[in-house]
């Protein structure tokens, strides 16, 4: 894996509040190597460690994006949901930002059919076929579409299990992490001071409650993915 410079600035991270952890009494001792100090009962995250792991994660996704790998971004709590969607759309990634449905990955043989169903129903609606349905059936179709869009809209183009999953909050997305562990899918995850860094392949020590912190970390990762896509396209055009 080639190391690159990703312009990860400690001052920028401080302004975003990346360094603020949880109350010291709520900590996970496994986060000790990533904690700088305790201030007024709050753990302060060591941002030099954050920068190191974030840079490592950026290198990984850059290389993987250049090989056409898939990266769903997962973050369903309200502080993360909007940032997850905007970052994923920017980098042409899949995303889940409303609710992680149990078995979304471990039961992919079923989950994978739902986006296809969504596209079929959407086509019916767009072509006006639903207008010929009885009123009750048309209303049912509309409800189905709304539900599928809400929970699966971000993965409607995902045709196979992902290669790497980016997770905005370990505690909130424990089911997703468990499924990735079961299937051996690598994860990149923001870990606050109450998390277990051993549950993820690349833990990024960071405040997982502040919108600015989540947005900054996700933007660095998705910028690296975009650069990986661009580098790959540039390489292909030079060959032809």
From Swiss-Prot:
InterPro entries: Ribosomal_uS2, Ribosomal_uS2_bac/mit/plastid, Ribosomal_uS2_CS, Ribosomal_uS2_flav_dom_sf. The gene is rps2. This is Small ribosomal subunit protein uS2c. One of its GO terms (biological process) is translation. GO terms for molecular function: structural constituent of ribosome. The keyword Chloroplast applies. Belongs to the universal ribosomal protein uS2 family. Keywords: Chloroplast, Plastid, Ribonucleoprotein, Ribosomal protein. GO terms for cellular component: chloroplast; mitochondrial small ribosomal subunit. It is found in: Plastid, Chloroplast.
């Amino acid at each position: 894996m080639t190391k690159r410079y990703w312009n990860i600035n400690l001052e920028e991270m401080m302004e975003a509040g990346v360094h603020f952890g949880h109350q010291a009494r709520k900590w996970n001792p496994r986060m000790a190597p990533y904690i700088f100090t305790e201030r007024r009962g709050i753990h302060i995250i060591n941002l030099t460690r954050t920068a190191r792991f974030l840079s490592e994660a950026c290198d990984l996704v850059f290389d993987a994006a250049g090989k056409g790998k898939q990266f769903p971004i997962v973050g369903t709590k309200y502080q993360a949901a909007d940032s997850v969607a905007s970052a994923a759309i920017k980098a042409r990634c899949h995303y889940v930002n409303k609710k992680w449905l149990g078995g979304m990955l471990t039961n992919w043989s079923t989950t994978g059919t739902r986006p296809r169903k969504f596209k079929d129903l959407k086509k019916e609606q767009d072509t006006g076929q639903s207008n010929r349905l009885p009123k009750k059936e048309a209303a049912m179709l509309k409800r189905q579409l709304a539900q599928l869009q809400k929970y699966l809209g971000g993965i409607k183009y995902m045709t196979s299990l992902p290669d790497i999953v980016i997770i905005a909050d370990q505690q909130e997305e424990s089911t997703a992490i468990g499924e990735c562990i079961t299937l051996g899918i690598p994860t990149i995850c923001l870990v606050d001071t109450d998390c277990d860094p051993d549950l993820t392949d690349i833990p990024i020590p960071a405040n997982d409650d502040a919108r600015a912190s989540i947005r900054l970390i996700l933007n660095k990762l998705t910028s690296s993915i975009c650069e990986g896509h661009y580098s790959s396209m540039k390489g292909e055009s030079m060959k032809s």
